[in-house]
């Protein structure tokens, strides 16, 4: 056996020896039995922990009993420099509808009609999703659309320029998606 392999196995053997000594319940009684009723020297007693302290994991298991009924606590989290003023906005909510979602990726140019003068209700515009090198204008896709409600969403993948503003009062619009191969 080479010297390198002996040094590699040394920590394993030391661990086995220490683990066996610590696994004994009463080291002092074992010492007296082996050494024929001689007391353990104080130098060795300091090296071995012969106290009767329970393992923290076992102690935790003993204390766990049947948990009675409990109610979850309210939980609120804020991360970063967020400012939450729930009491200020309580009166302004009223009926809530989802906000439009606009995503742009890649080489597309999307221009939608802006509704700058709309302060009340307005007609929903179709939703457009484009993938590839497309130039899509919302004005070209006007047609008869049946009555259904979806969540507003505008997605385009490529280099995009989106010039659309959203107001607080809106209704969901229909969705149209175009994929190029």
From Swiss-Prot:
Repeat (Sequence) residue spans along the chain: 59-84, 85-110, 111-136, 137-162
Tissue specificity field: Expressed in stems.
Region (4 X 26 AA tandem repeats): 59-162
Keywords: Repeat
Pfam family, one: Organ_specific
Region feature Disordered, mapped onto this chain: 94-181
Protein family according to the UniProt entry: To organ specific protein P4.
Record-given protein name: Organ-specific protein S2
Species assigned in the record: Pisum sativum (Garden pea)
């Amino acid at each position: 056996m080479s010297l390198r392999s002996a040094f590699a196995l040394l920590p394993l053997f030391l661990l086995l020896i220490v683990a066996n000594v610590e696994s004994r319940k009463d080291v002092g009684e074992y010492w007296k039995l082996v050494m024929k009723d001689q007391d353990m020297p104080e130098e060795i007693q300091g090296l071995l922990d012969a106290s009767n302290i329970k393992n923290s994991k076992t102690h935790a298991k003993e204390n766990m009993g049947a948990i009675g009924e409990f109610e979850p606590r309210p939980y609120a989290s804020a991360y970063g420099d967020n400012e939450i003023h729930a009491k200020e906005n309580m009166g302004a909510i009223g009926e809530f509808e989802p906000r439009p979602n606009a995503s742009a990726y890649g080489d597309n140019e999307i221009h939608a009609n802006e509704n700058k003068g709309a302060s009340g209700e307005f007609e929903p515009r179709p939703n457009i999703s484009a993938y590839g090198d497309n130039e899509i204008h919302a004005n070209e896709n006007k047609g008869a659309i049946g009555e259904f409600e979806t969540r507003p969403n505008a997605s385009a993948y490529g280099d995009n320029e989106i010039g659309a503003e959203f107001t607080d009062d809106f209704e969901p619009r229909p969705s149209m998606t175009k994929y190029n191969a």
